[in-house]
Regions:
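A short alpha-helical cap/connector motif
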Residues: 1-126, 133-154, 158-195
Length: 195
């Protein structure tokens, strides 16, 4: 029996009980959460960067946050921004279930446009963007300002369900994702890009 390589990669590092439970809560609310494969990559990247301070745009159900906590330094702090109060509430529940101390996170309920510009310059090791692609150009510029030298920006679910690869797709969300990719790819003074 042949296994699809994408399915194999997505399930190579299985989610623990806390992530599965958070994901199930998120499905009920319709949250946008990181996939298991992308979550494993976020854990890897946070660990490689020895991330102390991380910003997450789009808390969802907290699945991506839990993956980030797995890779961050034990004293690391996550700032997660989501404009949906229900998302922050179920994420907080997921963090409590996983025994993540409240001192390790800030859940901010507001628009990323109202929050990210107030974050401290050069104070973060990693910025993960999971939703609001229409705001991506602005978030990319702000990420450049708030990231420390050697920090990383991740646009989770960049492919937009395959639409970014399909030139015939012209909806605003897909165009915003494509434009964000071009900004990062073309700004070689500030970014080293990869898909």
């Amino acid at each position: 029996m042949r296994v699809d390589p994408h399915t194999f990669a997505e399930n190579f590092i299985p989610e623990d009980h806390f992530k599965s439970q958070a994901r199930a809560r998120g499905v009920e609310l319709g949250t946008v959460d990181t996939t298991p494969g992308a979550g494993a990559f976020l854990r890897f990247l946070a660990s490689t960067l020895k991330a102390q301070s991380v910003v997450e745009v789009g808390t969802g159900s907290g699945v991506g946050s839990l993956w980030l906590f797995d890779g961050m330094l034990p004293s690391g702090t996550l700032t997660s921004i989501d404009d949906e109060m229900e998302h922050s509430q179920i994420a907080k529940l997921a963090f409590a279930d996983a025994d993540i101390a409240p001192s390790r996170y800030r859940l901010i309920n507001n628009s990323v446009l109202d929050v990210i510009s107030k974050l401290t310059d050069r104070a973060y090791d990693l910025v993960v963007v999971r939703h609001n692609p229409e705001d991506l150009s602005y978030v990319i510029n702000e990420a450049q300002r708030i990231l420390r030298s050697g920090g990383a920006l991740v646009i989770d679910n960049y492919y937009g369900g395959g639409k970014v690869c399909d030139a015939a797709q012209r909806d605003p969300r897909t165009v915003a994702l494509r434009d964000a990719g071009k900004i990062i790819k073309n700004d070689t003074d500030h970014w080293v890009s990869s898909l």
